[in-house]
């Protein structure tokens, strides 16, 4: 079964809070969102983050591999420009987005494209699972998990000629959801000038 089939099946059969609501990192730091502009939601799923951005007056491009997810998002939020695409073959245009969100989707070769896709002063929200998740979910493919410190190191300002600034970083177990514990690395950064 390929990724698209797996996600289509999952979105057809599972009803989970986490699929339909915005991530806490985004809602807690809504103060960083501009009043207008174009945003990109990578691996948008059922549109929780995309809907939140739209409700804050932003235009939203949402990309997901699942046509089931995209169809559901479009029925709830017709204004979202939703794209069915495999992110392994997706091009992020340079200097286009004021906000990019990337929650629980790890594709390391997209990181530089996300930075380059931001306009000056644009903000990137990233949150991915850590290898620590293997202690409670050994079935997870380690390829899709971050090593300790990996996210912060990958976005070190020196790697991007000083054109980014980390605004917030956290690594560890999320304490707000005890029924579904998650070890995550989360970061908010801004592109400078």
Task: Please provide the spans of the model-predicted regions.
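Conserved beta-strand signature within the Rossmann-like core of class I S-adenosyl-L-methionine
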Residues: 122-133
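Conserved SAM-binding loop
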Residues: 73-74
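Conserved SAM-binding strand-loop segment of SAM-dependent methyltransferases
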Residues: 78-88
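A short, conserved alpha-helix within the catalytic core of class I
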Residues: 106-117
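A short acidic, Gly/Pro-enriched loop at the edge of an enzyme's catalytic core
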Residues: 91-99
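Conserved class I S-adenosyl-L-methionine
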Residues: 1-34, 36-45
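Conserved SAM/SAH-binding beta-strand->alpha-helix loop
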Residues: 66-68
């Amino acid at each position: 079964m390929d990724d698209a089939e797996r996600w289509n099946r999952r979105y057809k059969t599972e009803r989970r809070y986490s699929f339909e609501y915005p991530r806490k990192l985004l809602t807690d730091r809504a103060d960083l969102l501009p009043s207008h502009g174009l945003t990109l939601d990578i691996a948008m799923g059922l549109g929780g983050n995309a809907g939140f951005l739209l409700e804050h007056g932003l235009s939203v491009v949402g990309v997901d591999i699942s046509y089931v997810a995209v169809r559901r998002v479009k029925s709830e939020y017709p204004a979202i420009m939703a794209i069915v695409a495999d992110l392994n073959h997706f091009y992020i245009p340079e200097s286009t987005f004021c906000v990019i969100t990337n929650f629980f989707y790890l594709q390391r070769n997209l990181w530089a494209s996300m930075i380059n896709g931001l306009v000056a002063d644009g903000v990137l929200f990233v949150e991915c699972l850590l290898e620590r998740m293997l202690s409670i979910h050994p079935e997870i493919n380690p390829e899709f998990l971050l090593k300790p410190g990996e996210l912060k190191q990958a976005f070190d300002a020196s790697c991007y000629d000083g054109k980014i600034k980390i605004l917030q970083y956290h690594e560890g177990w999320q304490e707000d959801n005890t029924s579904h514990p998650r070890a995550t690395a989360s970061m908010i950064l801004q592109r400078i000038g």
